[in-house]
Amino acid sequence: MNIVILAAGTGKRMRSALPKVLHPLAGRPLLSHVIDTARALAPSRLVVVIGHGAERVRAAVAAPDVQFAVQEQQLGTGHAVRQALPLLDPSQPTLVLYGDVPLTRAATLRRLADAATDARYGVLTVTLDDPTGYGRIVRDQAGCVTRIVEQKDASADELKIAEINTGIVVAPTAQLSMWLGALGNDNAQGEYYLTDVVEQAIEAGFEIVTTQPDDEWETLGVNSKAQLAELERIHQRKLAEALLADGVTLADPARIDVRGKLTCGRDVSIDVNCVFEGDVTLADGVTIGANCVIRNAAIAAGARVDAFSHLDGATLGANTVVGPYARLRPGAVLADDAHVGNFVEVKNATLGHGSKANHLTYLGDADIGARVNVGAGTITCNYDGANKFRTVIEDDVFVGSDTQFVAPVRVGRGVTVAAGTTVWKDVAEGMLVLNDKTQTAKSGYVRPVKKKS
């Protein structure tokens, strides 16, 4: 089967410089969702028709299995499909999809394709309580489809019809090519409508078959930011329902956003207002607190991420505790039972088994061993303005508060670092390291008093 995706429209109502089909739904372009659905049908040819913002669209979705046809002027859906014809296999039927209709299930499209075999032309329709704005399916007394009429060209009686055309069709490619070549543009818009092919198919003796989706929202398109927001909520609701069905506990299914792939084990609990981006894995018994953002992370069994924490490219071992208000950046790796607390940032660093950095700390480009206690206010000074250097802290080190490690530096096993120390040279195993300081107390000091105006 050939699949053609129409993605050339200007999207004026979006009021955006970004091509409509590149606006994100669940963190990915609308068009990417449609391409994924198309791939699930294993097409022999997959062609995307581009026009407005063509090069941006091409760059966003380019892949070895995707071909592109360009519609230089937006002259209607029939004209758009015509641009794809040279790239299609004429011996296979063609399914036409839309880059701004992202939620159609592959199973729905498979049903339509299966119905439109031999000398049949398949149309996906849906019955709406309010069909305003859509092309109507006109049937004769026997229930056979006779034509599809657009809203602007419909009579008063035709406007009362509730069954509408979604625009998604399947047709035999060789005949479709002939029909498209014969299209006219004698209509209110002066465009070449793909829907007008139906009358030609009937005249050629083709039966018009219709199927409907299981859910109305499968056929909803995006023409405005309001519609995009509506589809986002529908999509997120379906994702939340799938998580609940898999046994995940959601404090409020209406307040979770999945913008990628979220894989959960047993007894996972997710509090409100959490966002998951990219590829995220939560193993058995993981607990995620409220208002967390987690991107491209793997979190092992029994771990806990407390509220307002941000994880990006991080790996957490079993029974780790993170947050609240922690930030783990790419390359952060926490071994089993490690703790990273409030206002701690970890970047390109490892924290060994049972090690803890519980308060107000920056650990960047560091290798920290097991059972290390990192005191509040500790900083790894990893950057000289041009180059990054690593700090190595071996097992069983105790780091006092307000300590700076000036990399590159290595601190040996079992070292104790006194509070307020700046470590800029390597420290041998088992040593106490501190900076000599004196404390002066002066009597008779009078603190200045601010004058009142």
Curated annotation (Swiss-Prot):
Q: What residues does acetyl-CoA bind to?
A: 376, 382-383, 401, 419
EC number per UniProt: 2.7.7.23, 2.3.1.157
Q: In which pathway does it act?
A: Nucleotide-sugar biosynthesis; UDP-N-acetyl-alpha-D-glucosamine biosynthesis; N-acetyl-alpha-D-glucosamine 1-phosphate from alpha-D-glucosamine 6-phosphate (route II): step 2/2; Nucleotide-sugar biosynthesis; UDP-N-acetyl-alpha-D-glucosamine biosynthesis; UDP-N-acetyl-alpha-D-glucosamine from N-acetyl-alpha-D-glucosamine 1-phosphate: step 1/1; Bacterial outer membrane biogenesis; LPS lipid A biosynthesis
Pyrophosphorylase as annotated region, ranges: 1-225
Location in the cell: Cytoplasm
Give the keywords, sorted: Acyltransferase, Cell shape, Cell wall biogenesis/degradation, Cytoplasm, Magnesium, Metal-binding, Multifunctional enzyme, Nucleotidyltransferase, Peptidoglycan synthesis, Repeat, Transferase
Q: Which Pfam families match?
A: Hexapep, NTP_transf_3
* Reactions mediated catalytically: alpha-D-glucosamine 1-phosphate + acetyl-CoA = N-acetyl-alpha-D-glucosamine 1-phosphate + CoA + H(+); N-acetyl-alpha-D-glucosamine 1-phosphate + UTP + H(+) = UDP-N-acetyl-alpha-D-glucosamine + diphosphate
What is its cofactor? Mg(2+)
Q: Which residues form the active site?
A: 359 (proton acceptor)
Q: How is the cofactor bound?
A: Binds 1 Mg(2+) ion per subunit.
Q: Please report which protein family the annotation says this sequence is part of.
A: In the N-terminal section; belongs to the N-acetylglucosamine-1-phosphate uridyltransferase family.
Q: Which NCBIfam families match?
A: glmU (TIGR01173)
> What subunit structure does UniProt give?
Homotrimer.
Q: What is this protein called?
A: Bifunctional protein GlmU
Q: Which organism is it from?
A: Burkholderia thailandensis (strain ATCC 700388 / DSM 13276 / CCUG 48851 / CIP 106301 / E264)
